[in-house]
């Protein structure tokens, strides 16, 4: 997926010379605040149907402590758990979410963030989780496959930057990392078994 690029900032003196030459004026402060940013995701978290955290990752210092994060999550849950909507606005942030059986999945961005972009990340996360959980997107299966859930999240968002919005690509990368890990563990097991065999034969001689 092609990442959005921020507008280039003019070097000192470039804006004045451009204005004198009849060119476009340098961006104003209001314009600069609307510049696209790679860092579009503030947080992703999953809560159970009582509002308790199951999984969470925050990508900036808006909520620097775990206590502040938990208060925010509780406020978000109270605002969204009894509504049919898929989007909410709270504390200057845009929140998109989806519920499944007994869990709620949330993606948080700034108030100026593109809602469709956030929704695409939410859909990617949900579809990828549905695949690794064999369509059982619920608390029990999530807790039993937490490593896979974190892999899905890491392949979708990294440091607040959207890496991927295609669930098929995410699943492929997660499977590759899982297979690679499995091969490594198998190789270690084979080395240990070979060492045991060598020790056994040396003792028999």
From Swiss-Prot:
<comment type="subunit">
    <text>Oligomeric complex.</text>
</comment>
<dbReference type="GO" id="GO:0005829">
    <property type="term" value="C:cytosol"/>
</dbReference>
<keyword id="KW-0931">ER-Golgi transport</keyword>
<keyword id="KW-0963">Cytoplasm</keyword>
<dbReference type="GO" id="GO:0033116">
    <property type="term" value="C:endoplasmic reticulum-Golgi intermediate compartment membrane"/>
</dbReference>
<dbReference type="Pfam" id="PF01217">
    <property type="entry name" value="Clat_adaptor_s"/>
</dbReference>
<feature type="compositionally biased region" description="Basic and acidic residues">
    <location>
        <begin position="1"/>
        <end position="12"/>
    </location>
</feature>
<dbReference type="GO" id="GO:0006890">
    <property type="term" value="P:retrograde vesicle-mediated transport, Golgi to endoplasmic reticulum"/>
</dbReference>
<feature type="compositionally biased region" description="Low complexity">
    <location>
        <begin position="13"/>
        <end position="30"/>
    </location>
</feature>
<dbReference type="GO" id="GO:0000139">
    <property type="term" value="C:Golgi membrane"/>
</dbReference>
<dbReference type="GO" id="GO:0015031">
    <property type="term" value="P:protein transport"/>
</dbReference>
<keyword id="KW-0653">Protein transport</keyword>
<comment type="similarity">
    <text>Belongs to the adaptor complexes small subunit family.</text>
</comment>
<protein>
    <recommendedName>
        <fullName>Coatomer subunit zeta-2</fullName>
    </recommendedName>
</protein>
<dbReference type="GO" id="GO:0030137">
    <property type="term" value="C:COPI-coated vesicle"/>
</dbReference>
<dbReference type="GO" id="GO:0030126">
    <property type="term" value="C:COPI vesicle coat"/>
</dbReference>
<comment type="function">
    <text>The coatomer is a cytosolic protein complex that binds to dilysine motifs and reversibly associates with Golgi non-clathrin-coated vesicles, which further mediate biosynthetic protein transport from the ER, via the Golgi up to the trans Golgi network. Coatomer complex is required for budding from Golgi membranes, and is essential for the retrograde Golgi-to-ER transport of dilysine-tagged proteins. The zeta subunit may be involved in regulating the coat assembly and, hence, the rate of biosynthetic protein transport due to its association-dissociation properties with the coatomer complex.</text>
</comment>
<keyword id="KW-0813">Transport</keyword>
<feature type="region of interest" description="Disordered">
    <location>
        <begin position="1"/>
        <end position="33"/>
    </location>
</feature>
<keyword id="KW-0968">Cytoplasmic vesicle</keyword>
<keyword id="KW-0333">Golgi apparatus</keyword>
<dbReference type="InterPro" id="IPR011012">
    <property type="entry name" value="Longin-like_dom_sf"/>
</dbReference>
<dbReference type="InterPro" id="IPR022775">
    <property type="entry name" value="AP_mu_sigma_su"/>
</dbReference>
<dbReference type="InterPro" id="IPR039652">
    <property type="entry name" value="Coatomer_zeta"/>
</dbReference>
<keyword id="KW-0472">Membrane</keyword>
